[in-house]
Amino acid sequence: MAFETFSVALDKDKTLIFETGKIARQASGAVLVKMNETWVFSSACAASLSEAVGFLPFRVDYQEKFSSAGRTSGGFLKREGRPSEREILVSRLIDRSLRPSFPNRLMQDIQVLSYVWSYDGKTLPDPLAICGASAALAISEVPQNCIIAGVRVGLVGGKWVINPTRDELSASKLDLVMAGTASAVLMIEGHCDFLTEEQVLEAIAFGQTYIAKICDAIEAWQKAIGKQKNFSAVLDMPEDVQNVVSDFIREKFEKALSFRDKEALEQASKELEESVIANLVQEENSDFSLLNVKAAFKTAKSNQMRALIQDLGIRVDGRTTTEIRPISIETPLLPRTHGSCLFTRGETQSMAVCTLGGENMAQRFEDLNGDGAARFYLQYFFPPFSVGEVGRIGSPGRREIGHGKLAEKALSHVLPETSRFPYIIRLESNITESNGSSSMASVCGGCLALMDAGVPIKAPVAGIAMGLILDRDQAIILSDISGIEDHLGDMDFKVAGTAKGITAFQMDIKIEGITHKIMEQALAQAKQGRSHILNLMTQVLASPKGTVSKYAPRIETMQINTSKIATVIGPGGKQIRQIIERSGAQVDINDDGVINIAASTQESINKAKELIEGLTGEVEVGKVYNGRVTSIATFGVFVEVLPGKEGLCHISELSKQKVDNISDFVKEGDKLAVKLLSINEKGQLKLSHKATLED
């Protein structure tokens, strides 16, 4: 393919440039996207499956090369390897944006790889990666139903900003990443400072205009240079197979839907599927293959569940479309933790635990912008027993990382300022039961665990997951969706916030986009559900506890002049190590001169403060100090009046009477009250014990 390029101007100094035909020419699709000096490369390749499967094997891997910012990793291994949390989150963004664009029953193994090759420290690469991956797929042989594009939207100084720079985003009240087609939204994810539903909708509408512009340009490029799409890899569903399977299960599945609990429904559904396979799969007839029959069974189940909701307004567990499952809350739960809560909503349960600590407990990370440390972080755990299964235990999967980060963002906006609450805060959400909306249960349980731990949050936060049944030109929004509604429905729209406004949201859909009107309805219904949950939460715990747990460390801060930081640290860290050893406290010094002191007892904190004040304090002429004799000479004694500051008390200044032998008067290590008489031009201190006797 010859070198081809096009560009899309979004705003001043924000022009997307797409290039292909120069790099990675053997890939099915390869595109380099540039904006200023941030360049992101994306490739798309597909392989035929040796055996048909009942799902789409689609994999996205996004990687930020340290070399793109002129850096290498600070770790021992300098080669990029295991993806960072941020790389996993961006990979998920790309995956969730692109997945709805593929035809149903596409039997290809598809891989999209995205690399940040150049990063200018200003232009953020994730929306470029979404657009680049979409463009690479668009010009490849991989079949798609639609072209997609992605953008980021910020709210800076009351104005919407498209693809905000890093500096703009730091000042923004909104961080929204969204993807869609030229006419509809496919994916949104973001967090914000208590924006209203109307403001979020306005932001989405603003971003959609730019998405449409990019989609139109990619589509024109596809028509001009794109490869022929391989739609032969898309399996058709024979109409008679779907009809036979639907007729076979109609009455049986209607009976299964009468079961109101997850376990009974799943068991009945499993037995029914086994019966369908045993009775309808025909080895001699490829139309009635195992793959086709299983796919038809899933479609028939979905259609029957939808019909129940559309015709009767009743869901599989007997609820109405706006009804929220029963909620129970127990806090505190665990006796020795700093804060805990057991939050149960229907058959979804989160045991949330809050742990408070000093600076050494901060979550360290490294990315293209350098090293950093998170003051607050939430870790989500999803063990296999939560769904009654046997599975692997180990490092977290992409789903766990994504769910944890969403809940973390939802709660981060209500945390107090560090100056008011200097603790590092770790939240963990242990999912002990799951039947849908576990990430939103993590928000609710996590909020209550924070309050139980005495974290003075600005307001309680609750979360709810909304679903959608879209058929016959009728859109039905479901509040607090269960697992089967997530699996068989058209949308999973999670919204978290306070009574005042929204703090985080995430939407994934399985159809080719939804309209502004549907999102408006979903957000309005989510607000009602959120208010209901917040009311139940505040009935149990109306406000944060006034003090932290007796088992939590005590933390105090003090401010020193930045010129004294080196004095406190000492050569090779000698002084600060001595402070830690002598006080038993953990001491952390920030570049701005703020010192955090953490210890299990107040005595340790006081001792550390005393030692630091001694190092940083200035001696005053005329002031009396209770010093320590550090050495003895024939002409006098040297006395340390403050840590690191000592002076000479001449033999004539030791007593009103004549002192013949200093060793008979004082010993090394003795405490000796001395008065500072003067400081000479060399900074040497002249001390007198005799003057204290006169006083």
UniProtKB/Swiss-Prot annotation:
Q: What does this protein do?
A: Involved in mRNA degradation. Catalyzes the phosphorolysis of single-stranded polyribonucleotides processively in the 3'- to 5'-direction.
| Catalytic reactions of this protein | RNA(n+1) + phosphate = RNA(n) + a ribonucleoside 5'-diphosphate
Q: Which GO terms describe its cellular component?
A: cytosol
Can you name the source organism?
A: Chlamydia trachomatis serovar L2 (strain ATCC VR-902B / DSM 19102 / 434/Bu)
The kind of enzyme this is, by top-level EC class, is transferase
**KH domain: residues covered:** 553-612
The positions annotated for binding Mg(2+) are D486, D492
InterPro entries tied to this protein: ExoRNase_PH_dom1, ExoRNase_PH_dom2, ExoRNase_PH_dom2_sf, KH_dom, KH_dom_type_1, KH_dom_type_1_sf, NA-bd_OB-fold, PNPase
User: Can the keyword Oxidoreductase be found in this entry's annotation?
Assistant: no
Q: Which cofactor does it need?
A: Mg(2+)
| Pfam families reported for this sequence | KH_1, PNPase, RNase_PH, RNase_PH_C, S1
State the family named in the UniProt similarity comment for this chain.
Answer: Belongs to the polyribonucleotide nucleotidyltransferase family.
Keywords noted in UniProt: Cytoplasm, Magnesium, Metal-binding, Nucleotidyltransferase, RNA-binding, Transferase
Q: What processes does the entry annotate via GO biological process terms?
A: mRNA catabolic process; RNA processing
Q: Using the record's annotation, list all stretches that form the S1 motif domain.
A: 622-690
Q: Which E.C. number(s) belong to this protein?
A: 2.7.7.8
Q: In which compartments does the protein localize?
A: Cytoplasm
Question: Which protein are we looking at?
Answer: Polyribonucleotide nucleotidyltransferase
Query: What terms describe the molecular function in GO for this protein?
Result: 3'-5'-RNA exonuclease activity; magnesium ion binding; polyribonucleotide nucleotidyltransferase activity; RNA binding
UniProt superkingdom: Bacteria
